[in-house]
Each structure stands twice: as C-alpha cells, then as structure tokens.
Amino acid sequence: SCSTIPNFILPKSLKIMNTELKQQINEVYMSRESINPYLNSKDDTSLEKDHPKRIFSKRYNGYLNSDLFKKDSEMKFLYEQEELLKFVSACVGISPIYRWADPLACHAYNIMKSDGILPWHFDSCEFTLSIMLQKPEKGGIFEYCPNIRGPGNENFDQVKKVLYGERKRVRQLKLEPGDLQIFKGRFTLHRVTKIEGNRS
C-alpha cells in the first residue's frame, strides 16, 4: 500500500521547488477543522457514539493551490511529464491512469506549520503521489495501517481500535527531502503527526 523512492528529485530541482514555495508563502491558505476518518465534518447522530464516523480529530494544514503556480514551475513541469504518468502506471499496475483535472488541487503544495496535523483518515482517491520538500524540526511522521479496510469491508472495529490508540497495525515511514511516495490511501488508514518547531 506504500512505496518510497529515495532521492527521486535532484537536489537542484528540490532547491528550486522550495524557493518557489517560499516566494508565494503569503498565498497559502491555512485552515483548521475537525474531521472524521472519512473526511466528513458533520456528525451522524443515527450511529452509535463510538462509531468511527462519529470520532472527530483536529486537522490543521494549508495549500498553495495549483492555479497559483508560475508557468515555468518545476513542480508543474514534473506533473505534466508523460514519463511520470507511465512510470506510476507501471508501479501501481493500473492502465490507463489519468492526471487529476482539478485546476486547484492537481499538484498543490501541502504546507504544515507549527502545530500542523493531519489526523487519521482515508483518502477519497485510490492512490496519491507525494514529494517531501522539507522536514520539520520535530514531528511530522507519516503513520499508516496498511489495507485496514477493503471493498465491501469497512472493518469499523479495527479502525476504531486505531482511533482509540491501539498501535498493533501502525507502521511509520520517515521521509527525507526529495523522496517520492506512492501511496494507496483509499483502503489504508493514515495520518501525519503534529509538527513542532519553526520550520514548515
């Protein structure tokens, strides 16, 4: 459910991407909300109180939307390469695959400042690609529970155990700047632990 390619981005390109983001940092939209693992913020009172869909956690992060990127953006260039599309298709064993058409989120930068956190959740898409640009001073560890649910089996009991702190299924992935992560998040519960320090 999770694969990492270390040093996928060359140091020169990594530096350009970091500079690109810093130059537009004032355009980053930061938001806070409480969500359940299914990315919903509304409570369903028809369910039992301890149902996973009724367990909410704080989320705090921000995005530099894709439509704000300059035409010569290094990240935009990478995203639009046919070679990358073919490579990812081969990695996940799905063909054909398509780029996300959303002009705001297709290759957005995800920013987490001090106290930033992404709580336990499932993704709405089958898989995602992430590139680590910069590590925080402390925290920001990617944790995941591989294939804890599947098609036709939500496995609510096991999901609930993780939400209440059980660590038996939890794995950690320590990413370094320049690493590419290919992650199947639709069926794998995952989170990013709280960021500490002044480095976003």
List PLM regions with ranges.
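Hydrophobic alpha-helical segments and helix pairs
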Residues: D44-C91
